[in-house]
Amino acid sequence: MKGILKDIFQLNLPAKAALNAFTASLAKSLKESAGDSNVVGFKSIVCYRTGLNVAIVSCTASLESSLVDLFKTYKEEGRLRLAHKALNDLVVRIAVELASEHDIPGKSYQFILKLPQISKCFIIE
C-alpha cells in the first residue's frame, strides 16, 4: 500500500484525483493478488491503528484531507504511516468489497469476513 501511495504522491495530483487514483490502484492490486496462487490471504494492521469500528462511509472531504496530511508528512519526513481513520476505514471497505465480490477458495481475510456486507457507496467518483 505504501508503494501505491508513493507512486501517486510522485504525480503531484490534486487531492480528489489522488484519492481516486489511490482507491482504484488499491482495489486493482488487491484483486490481482486475490487471483495469485502464491497469495494465501490478506492481513492488514489498519484496524490496530484506528480500531475495528469501521465506518460504512466516509465523506470525501475527510478522505481528501487525510490524504493531503499524509502527503505533507511524506514530503517533510519521508515516511508514510496510515494512521488516519477515514483512510484506514476506506482500505478495509475496499478489501471487504473485494472479499464479497470474489469467492476465492483458500484465501483468508483477517477481520473482514465478520463485517456485514456493505454497498459500493464508498467508491469515490
Which sequence ranges carry the predicted segments?
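Catalytic pocket-lining loop regions of alpha/beta-barrel enzymes
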Residues: 51, 65-125
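Short amphipathic alpha-helices and their capping/turn segments at secondary-structure boundaries
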Residues: 23-40, 94-98
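Active-site gating loops and adjacent loop-to-helix segments of metal-dependent hydrolytic enzymes
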Residues: 1-11, 55-81
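Extended, H/D-rich, highly charged conserved domains that either
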Residues: 32, 47, 52-54, 100
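Long, mid-chain structured domain cores
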Residues: 1-24, 30-33
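Alpha-helix N-cap and loop-to-helix initiation/capping positions
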Residues: 14-21, 25, 62, 83-87, ...
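Hydrophobic faces of well-ordered beta-strands that scaffold small-molecule active sites
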Residues: 1, 40-44, 106-108
